[in-house]
Amino acid sequence: MATQTIKQTSTSKGRQTSVGDILKPLNSEYGKVAPGWGTTVLMAVFMALFAVFLVIILELYNASVLLDGLAVSWQ
């Protein structure tokens, strides 16, 4: 018994929308790699700032900053 494989190809390219036209330039650089470090340093700066933000939030949650003078009671 033979098996027949039929290749189905789609002839429609999809609908062109105004949102797609706006977003297309953002995807035009896909696959290209910038030489050197690129924006790695900028990313590291924002990661460090985010880490500082998280530490501040943690310290506030633990009542170890700004809340030292307040009595906290769960009763």
From Swiss-Prot:
Record keywords, A-Z: Chloroplast, Membrane, Phosphoprotein, Photosynthesis, Photosystem II, Plastid, Thylakoid, Transmembrane, Transmembrane helix
GO biological process: photosynthesis; protein stabilization
Membrane-related topology note: Single-pass membrane protein
Record-linked InterPro entries: PSII_PsbH (IPR001056), PSII_PsbH_sf (IPR036863)
Keyword Phosphoprotein: yes
Membrane spanning stretches: 41-61
Post-translational modification: Phosphorylation is a light-dependent reaction catalyzed by a membrane-bound kinase; phosphorylation occurs on Thr residue(s) in the N-terminus of the protein.
Pfam families documented for this protein: PsbH
GO CC terms: chloroplast thylakoid membrane; photosystem II
Subcellular location: Plastid, Chloroplast thylakoid membrane
Main location: plastid
Molecular functions per Gene Ontology: phosphate ion binding
Positions where Phosphothreonine occurs in the chain: 3, 5
Assembly with partners or alone: PSII is composed of 1 copy each of membrane proteins PsbA, PsbB, PsbC, PsbD, PsbE, PsbF, PsbH, PsbI, PsbJ, PsbK, PsbL, PsbM, PsbT, PsbX, PsbY, PsbZ, Psb30/Ycf12, at least 3 peripheral proteins of the oxygen-evolving complex and a large number of cofactors. It forms dimeric complexes.
Function: One of the components of the core complex of photosystem II (PSII), required for its stability and/or assembly. PSII is a light-driven water:plastoquinone oxidoreductase that uses light energy to abstract electrons from H(2)O, generating O(2) and a proton gradient subsequently used for ATP formation. It consists of a core antenna complex that captures photons, and an electron transfer chain that converts photonic excitation into a charge separation.
Family: Belongs to the PsbH family.
PANTHER family (alphabetical): PHOTOSYSTEM II REACTION CENTER PROTEIN H
Official protein name in the record: Photosystem II reaction center protein H
Species, as recorded: Zygnema circumcarinatum (Green alga)
